[in-house]
């Protein structure tokens, strides 16, 4: 019983530590400057950073990543560390989704796939990150951007990733973030930000 309580205290302490780290990372960026950035390069870098981070912790993790980058995109003024954090959060969630689905699918073939598309859309840039994981239920959709809401097991998620991502895109970059999902089929996040 003492050992069980110690484990619970340790898990709770680790989660609190992770939450505080997330808040500190987010609050640091108040006076960040907007820099003309190659979003193709930045996005690609953080897509693969996420993949390798997940792979380092789970040697059995494997996924096909299909990338489409519009190399004619002009440089776009963004806060690079914030935009990259948004990409990282969405990619981490996509990796988690396909990995958790692959662990639950034993008998029929499942090929974990994440699609990343970055393109010019009139006077905006559109970034789409789509996975073929378990999808998101209607109940979860309603709470998706709520701070501290997570569907991950204790110790694996803080519930800050999507709320921070929404804030980065909408408040700091005058953009939009939308999510479409079909249970057991796909989840697709679409970010648009103005080209300026």
Regions found by a protein language model. Give the residues of each.
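Core catalytic ATP-binding domain of two-component histidine kinases
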Residues: 1-196
């Amino acid at each position: 019983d003492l050992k069980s309580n110690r484990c619970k205290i340790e898990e709770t302490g680790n989660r609190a530590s992770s939450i505080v780290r997330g808040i500190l990372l987010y609050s640091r960026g108040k006076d960040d400057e907007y820099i003309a950035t190659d979003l193709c390069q930045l996005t690609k870098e953080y897509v693969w950073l996420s993949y390798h981070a997940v792979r380092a912790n789970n040697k059995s993790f494997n996924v096909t990543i299909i990338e489409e980058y519009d190399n004619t995109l002009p440089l776009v003024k963004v806060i690079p560390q914030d935009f990259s954090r948004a990409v990282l959060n969405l990619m981490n969630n996509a990796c988690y989704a396909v990995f958790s689905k692959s662990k639950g699918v034993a008998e029929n073939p499942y090929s974990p796939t994440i699609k990343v598309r970055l393109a010019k859309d009139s006077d905006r840039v559109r970034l789409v990150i789509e996975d073929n994981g378990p999808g998101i239920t209607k109940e979860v959709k309603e709470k998706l951007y709520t701070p501290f809401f997570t569907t991950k097991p204790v110790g694996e998620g803080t519930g800050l990733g999507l709320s921070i991502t929404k804030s980065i895109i909408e408040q700091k970059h005058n953009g939009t973030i939308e999510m479409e999902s079909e249970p057991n089929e796909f989840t697709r996040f679409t970010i648009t930000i103005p080209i300026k």
